[in-house]
């Protein structure tokens, strides 16, 4: 019995005792079929109460902790814990998986909820962020996710009446979520004063925004919107765990054991207290309730389920019970009856009836029970306790017989002897005690040899011996009852054991895996009858093994269900059942045993479906004698597809080497050559490790692949068209069922799949991001909409794609060994089959995952490695080809029969209408009928069968066949040897294409006179190829060893070949027969060359570091060149045949003279003068420039120079073929590079006439033929080589504005940092001294004077309740573009400033606002499609900025896109249909992302450029083509599926043009693109080639261009000095040939336009300086609509004391006076310096302005003439004030001073006093009402009071308390302590202002918020209202004179906001 096979018998889960009531809630429901659904451990249970039956869902692999019922009451969603937890949606009727949601949550899924129509599912994770996710669950697609909360979330629910509203609750919070686009945004519920902030445990949503929630204290909290509106107190007396909403109303259940029913308005109906009922008990706690019509379900903490019928509510029925919380270890089965007993840490012992599936008795103990044992007659029951004691009970009435405590540690194992006389008790102390049953359990023996705790014990049949296992893994034997150790091996061997529950011992060594020391098997039990053993382990698996199982690593069957530790397993007395107990899940599973041969087939397909199937994956072999793997298959399974370095590493390598060598001054790089190459033909086909990779297109062309190229071969013309989109070896290829589309998959770190069109060779979709290493198998679905792929990662992941969209639909792990083929079921789109090494699996897609079943072999066959598979014509038939040569025929997943087809593996199979064709390793093609009953015809592939039209020769007869296909009356065959043949049905075969076999190709030589070349490879063949139009192999010869080099003699008659063993031979070039051979070296021969003319000498270079020189005529070695310190890589002769140039692996360039090999040292200048016969060397000054910057890693393997010494071609280790102009002096020359080879280009050679370049590709086995395209012929068709990169060093032009914009760093903005450098303790953190004011309330003293002088304009004091944004002065032009548009045919305009999107009506001038952004808006675009009228998109700065799409008229948000562009989004644009949106970020990669904005789905994303991208715009007629421009950047993009492909703009040979920094883009018909450059030129592109320049369209940079869709006219805007004929705005015709200029009349020296838009007869212009101007097209008149401040912070602000005017003063050097009523600019004055503060005099006549340079000026308000100015300080004036009597001027500066001036003394402004002792810079000042005092706030968070005008500080609190102030703008002081927020660590409150009525204060802070408080504001963290609009810093704020308006100014946003007071 020493085989290791799995047993043929099986288990099936029949019953589970238990319900998970702990740590879960809301997990119990009625289904539509009136069954009860719940979960326990890892099993979903559907329990039918009427029939008392259970169904199980086994799709999880760990504990289930959450459950939701679909509105249809049939589907169920369950979520689990685990490292990669997933959600299963399954059908409660047939317990099959419907969908899997995975790859998002970690740790676990805590809550689930379906929305009201059941389409979407919300889930909450157990991760630290408690992530909330919304799924389209049928598709398995994540719609949105967001951080849920910092603490646990307990419940989540959809609002049934508002489709996008979700509510979640948990620890101390409730949140109301809105789903918009892909953004989930939450608002916290406001508890307010209505109820205490506390933990909310459950919730239900009702109509009209009402939410009911259950709180921890037993109250019901009722919410309306976000606010708590009322509480229902004492609904329960403790926490409410569960709330269930249904038609009838609501049911709640709590920790108090009560169920309460409420009507739909939450009025109480009734209360049921389960504690008071018959089965109730103290401490009963309800975790889950469900109400359906007249029935209620309640699940309790202690794992019971009650059913209550409402009419008989005092008689609840206990329909299910299990063990409570606490580990469950004890299990014993009755020796005579179908009874089981369990004991648990919940201190109960329970007796279960296995026949009735019911609990029949329960007995509570004082202590936790850890082991139980029945006496052999079943009358007594022994219990082992956790405290070291044991108790014996009488079974019939459960009364105690004895209670003995001899040990301290837990008793884990006990057994009665088979004769019933002894009880052995094993404890964790180590010994086993033996007690005599008849003597009232007197202790009579002790087994004490064990050093560790006892884990298992077994008695011998005769009760004379005992064996033990312990924690140290020892197995010991004792004589009974004395307990003496037994050591004699012989004696032990013969003992028959009564039971076998030990895990150690020879009989069970097979249960342990090989080579590991683990202790994770907790329990086993042997069934001697059926020779099987059951085991339970720490991974939650119950396994069946054969018994005995002697060899380690035996195969088994495994069963899932328990989640974590299975603590015990036992057979029932009659072996009908196995019982298993779960430790942590404290459940008992009852499994039915199905012996071998019973209803085998029926059972195999039982609906035991789940993620893991019940026949294990680790143990998938039913055989111990696994057949030998076929050598080909074994070799293939061992191929490693990892690369040392991938092409995508190149930019980084370049960057690193730049950083390393940054000191090198940059010399002028050599120019790239004019000539170019075109790939014309490739010899080769990849057959050695690929299959099914050869197809006919409908046009009859043949498509296959080699290296990184997919080939479309025309049989008639023997020509090839090539798809060159891949950048590494292609490994798989498949063709679309309907169209001529092909999918190809490649090698790669992130391996890509391309779907492309064979007609146009254009990529339709590029699929990435799912596979590692490579893609080894592909197949289209029958309808062609989906594609399935298999990767080469360790799990061979399977991915199902919607290829057009480029989205993955579903993924799963495939198999641990290689999968060879995947096939889609032609009848069912969602089914697949895979075959591979010892593997066949049938897959069913379920949402985002797959469920699988393994093929069931039964007795028909045994598990084999399968090489190919096909579906039959009948629906459920599958045919697979095995490594043995058999065809296996399957029906569904059952094997029907096998048919012998080939000798050796069946590698290929193709299904026809009426049959199949197969191909095998035996080189035979067989045609079969449709059931593989008859073989209709065979074709052996032999040389003799080849037709004359063949394009080559067969290397050998019967080559192994790897691919086969039928079509066009032929069979197409691909062989392992790299041949493609076409077999005519009548027999003759034509060889179409061939190449080398597996192995690297290095040797390449071109014939000196004819178009012929030779190659030699590690595949041990030498081949001669014809390169004329025939393209075929002329001759081939097998060699004894592989070879790495070859060379023709000068006359072409002889061919020398160097081999890898150090020998070389010379063969006749025509017959390839030997002429001579030598073996002088041990290491490989690396290069070989004949000298020129007569070919007198042959030089042979080897890896032995020598070059040997032979005389050809005498066949003697005449010289040896010594002196190289490393292996030789290249050699070349000079044209006289005298001098040899040698390169070595140590990068030495050496020279030797023939014949003796004497070494010469030659100076570099001389080397160039020598005429060389050939140049294949890679070192020396003339080819220094061929080495890339990162060449420490990659090597240039080969070079070849044309005869005229003008072009040098090289091949390198990145698969690039490059062309350089020779000589290549200086570093890093420019080149043209070409792709096609995959990893290494090993050799390159020009043909004798230099018209063709030949290259060979190392491991890709390909020989590629490139034709040289000369300069002259190119013009007609521009050749698109990958140009060498446009270098950063190259100057892209300069302009100050562009440079500034490039340098803007948005990160400093994101994190709200204080805008002033304050130091000290924040006010709300300072310790407060007790003020005088806090006197006793009753006092005879006179009343305190007012804090603030009240201006009694109106008699009644007005409280400001609310602010509303009324108008904004500002437009962001300084770093944005194209952000100003017409709406509604020119009636409105839309633009942005700060964080506000603004729509302004041109006729009324009124504005409306979009205020949902949280920081500066950076870009704005309007959807041009009529279907999406007035749809606007805007985006902003931020760490995870969002794009908002909104309706410009209603301001309603249509979608929100959360982006990955860190820092901010700086340009967005809609596609032609308006459905897509493209965005580009200011992140370091300048990522470009395309979105489907309505769904919120990201379509594609890719790094755009290393420097700033300014504009990215879709072509106006396309949804897939767009253009991006930026700093030296011009790319033309195509959206292919979910990938972005680009072509760089090719400048070509247009004389003056070079790649500039491009700033703007416009479009014309016929694929014309116009781009505006930094130097004022406009570049005109056709496709991606530059065709002309519009020179100097503007004199400075062309910042903006606008394409008018209706007539194609183009508007440009630039930076230009206004002249007569020029202008900063121009209107052009469609081709930009003629234009008309417009002046803007702004009066500035240089006009700089940032945005243009054309409406009906008008052009809308936005300038850098914040002006918005409308220009008439006819009359060229310009009208200024908005004239905001220019760039620079605005700090100065003052409102007029008696009129609706205010003044703002900014760092832009201007002061502006605005009219509040008419919302317009009245006047502006240029001050010449940045201004920091402003103040009106109380009489309104004068205004004082303080400057940043320490100067201040006083202007007369009416004329704005200067009345006086003075500069007594050198640093900034921070605040300036005029006293209430117009007499004193106070000037506060950064120099810690306040200066006083007397205005009555006239304009010379002499200082009359100043304040000192000010601790820091001044920030605000206020005069007292009588003008005698001034209060000064400082940068140290200190407020001081000084006398005026002497400046003495007042310190007596009594005096200060009595002062009445004329105004209050201070942010410091007890009166305003409440304005400081909690989160002000890095950010300050910058400004404040109290109303003239003295009742309110408004503040502005570093978060960009304007806040409204009551005044005085003396309680910390006072309540307030907050208003958004400004971006980061609000710098100043004032009420207007009559408190009707608030004016606020922004720091960075340069905007002035006017708010109406309500």
Swiss-Prot record:
Chain intervals with Basic and acidic residues compositional bias: 1322-1337
Region (Disordered): 603-626, 1322-1353
One Pfam match: Beta-prop_EML_2
Keywords: Cytoplasm, Cytoskeleton, Microtubule, Repeat, WD repeat
A GO cellular component entry from the record: microtubule
Repeat recorded as keyword: yes
InterPro entries the record matches: Beta-prop_EML-like_2nd, Beta-prop_EML_1st, Haem_d1_sf, HELP, Quinoprotein_ADH-like_sf, WD40/YVTN_repeat-like_dom_sf, WD40_repeat_dom_sf, WD40_rpt
Molecular-function annotations in GO: microtubule binding
Skewed-composition ranges (Acidic residues): 615-626
UniProt-annotated location(s): Cytoplasm, Cytoskeleton
Gene3D superfamilies the record matches: YVTN repeat-like/Quinoprotein amine dehydrogenase
Keyword Cytoplasm: yes
SUPFAM superfamilies tied to this protein: C-terminal (heme d1) domain of cytochrome cd1-nitrite reductase, Quinoprotein alcohol dehydrogenase-like, WD40 repeat-like
WD repeats: 59-100, 104-145, 148-187, 195-233, 235-273, 280-321, 323-362, 364-403, 406-445, 561-601, 725-766, 770-811, 814-853, 861-900, 901-940, 996-1035, 1038-1077, 1080-1120, 1191-1230, 1236-1276, 1412-1456, 1460-1501, 1504-1543, 1553-1591, 1593-1638, 1685-1724, 1726-1767, 1768-1807, 1880-1919, 1925-1958
Major location category of this protein: cytoplasm
Top-level division of the source organism's lineage: Eukaryota
PANTHER family, per the entry: ECHINODERM MICROTUBULE-ASSOCIATED PROTEIN-LIKE 6, WD-40 REPEAT PROTEIN
Family: Belongs to the WD repeat EMAP family.
Function summary: May modify the assembly dynamics of microtubules, such that microtubules are slightly longer, but more dynamic.
Protein name in UniProt: Echinoderm microtubule-associated protein-like 6
Classification lineage: Eukaryota, Metazoa, Chordata, Craniata, Vertebrata
Gene name linked to the record: EML6
